Amino acid sequence: QEPLQLFGERIGVAFQLVDDLIDIESTKEESGKVAGTDLLAGVPTLPVLLLSKFEDAESKALYQKITSGLTLEDLPTVLASLREHPVMEQARAETVRWGDQAIEAVMALPAGSVREALVAFANAVVDRKG
């Protein structure tokens, strides 16, 4: 595939994964979004998908609470639990991996301002908070 096509696909995935993290980690002031809207809507996000792989009782209970009809009343507790859970570190690492793969794709382009701008854009996508 062409470097720019690969870049676009990979940075698009990274953008969505960052959005999954923002839904859990950020405040309305930071992102403009109410935290947990994807969770309440039952949207399958990367942290929840990764959480399903954990075998400990606490993780299983958290996953069950999220996937069996999460309520607005339970949301603050669930968000706090997710924010402290190792699954968030795993999800962040996966997001960084996609960003790194996007950067790797544009390394096939000639050195110069275009490549530098794409690398800067990829880094900004992965580092965004809102």
Question: Language-model features: where?
Answer:
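All-alpha prenyltransferase/terpene-synthase fold signal
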Residues: 1-130
